[in-house]
Regions:
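Chalcogenol-based redox active-site neighborhoods
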Residues: 1-176
């Protein structure tokens, strides 16, 4: 996947819009992968699901903590992708106390499938989800890919290590 372009996909997000008023001042916003990644160098990490143990205990807090250091190494933004809808992703980011990393809800799994990372996790009652990966994207081109070992449908485990913020930081420091 390295040196290939990210797939064309649309992310469906809810954004606060004070002009709406009322108890739910949010509107739909649609961003394409091109709008998100063009003319930028970003870190993206993807995980099986919001509110899941490894994702909530290690991966999201780790990237949030490492945000400033990652940015200092020539990265414009840090994104988390999950095959969850915008409502779930927003609530999860609030629950996690995230202030810096940005959520990209891939509710239809289109981006994840285009990355070749969509797996079946029906053995856990999850349905189709993302395999855990991280990547550095430069101007829509995948510069570096980190993928957990053992990618397969209905994987009995949840490997984590190769896609940690520490691994991404190590790479960024080596190429800086």
């Amino acid at each position: 996947m390295e040196m290939n372009f990210v797939p064309d996909a649309t992310f469906y997000m809810r954004v606060r819009d004070e002009s709406i008023g009322g108890d739910n001042p949010f509107r739909w916003d649609y961003k394409t992968s091109k709008e998100i990644f063009l003319h930028k160098r970003v870190v993206v990490f993807s995980l099986p699901g919001a509110f899941t143990p490894t994702c909530s205990t290690f991966q999201v807090p780790g990237f949030e903590k490492a945000y400033d250091e990652i940015r200092s190494l020539g990265i414009d933004e840090v994104y988390v992708i999950s095959v969850n809808d915008a409502f779930v992703m927003r609530k999860w980011m609030i629950d996690q106390g995230v202030e810096h990393i940005k959520a990209l809800p891939d509710g239809n799994g289109a981006f994840t499938e285009g990355m070749g990372m969509l797996v079946d996790k029906s053995n856990l009652g999850f349905g189709k989800r993302s395999w855990r990966y991280a990547m550095v994207v430069q101007d829509c081109l995948v510069e570096k890919m980190f993928v957990e070992d053992g990618k397969m449908d209905n994987c009995p485990g949840d490997p984590y290590g190769d896609t940690s913020p520490e691994m991404v930081l190590q790479y960024l420091k080596n190429v800086a």
